[in-house]
A protein has these predicted regions:
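Eukaryotic scaffold repeat domains enriched in small/polar residues
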Residues: 1-185
Length: 185
């Protein structure tokens, strides 16, 4: 961590708040106990308004949550059986004052997850692999605007931005919604 005003180094830490090590952890094994260190690359670190820091441990398929001083708070695994590039690529928070929701881009499984931030419960996901609207080709980054719309970008050969319009909050019929196909007005 660096001081935002002065740019001075303050502190750093690894998984679970441990001192980081650069030891090669070998390949990720979803059946093994959770790695006690982050695997490379740690793909995002986002600070919520309440002061909690969310870290995307991409190849370990998990988000770890910390206090600003490095104290470990909790973790959640997302698509834990994802090998290779991992499932936790980027996150964004909803724009309500409490940042009630966390949105996660999973580039390996071509999905966006909507997660209840306080419990880290997955409420729903949408998307699938492909090049049509509503599909993803290595969804890499995610952001939200002041109106609650979600924006995604893709890497490798995806090379596009998609916008998903916020239409309100309602009941979700199933956990995985698949592709959200565009509808005519």
């Amino acid at each position: 961590m660096y001081d935002a005003d002065s740019g001075k180094y303050k502190r750093h830490w690894g998984a679970y708040g441990h001192k980081p090590e650069d030891t090669n952890l070998g390949n990720y094994d979803p059946d093994a106990p959770p790695a006690q260190q982050f695997r490379n690359p740690v793909h995002c670190a986002e600070l919520a308004k309440d002061g909690l820091l969310y870290v995307c441990d991409r190849v370990n398929d998990r988000i770890q949550v910390f206090k600003k001083d490095g104290t470990f708070v909790k973790e959640v695994f997302i698509a834990k059986r994802t090998l290779g590039d991992g499932s936790v690529w980027d996150i964004a928070f909803s724009k309500d004052p409490q940042q009630k929701y966390l949105y996660l881009a999973d580039g390996a499984n071509e999905k966006i997850y909507i997660i209840l931030r306080d419990s880290m419960e997955i409420l729903t996901s949408f998307g699938d692999g492909g090049r049509q609207p509503g599909q993803f080709y290595a969804v890499h980054s995610i952001a939200t605007d002041s109106k609650g719309n979600i924006y995604t970008t893709e890497t490798y050969r995806g090379q596009r931005v998609q916008r998903f319009l916020y239409k309100g909050i309602g009941t979700v019929a199933k956990v995985d919604q698949g592709v959200l196909w565009p509808r005519s007005k």
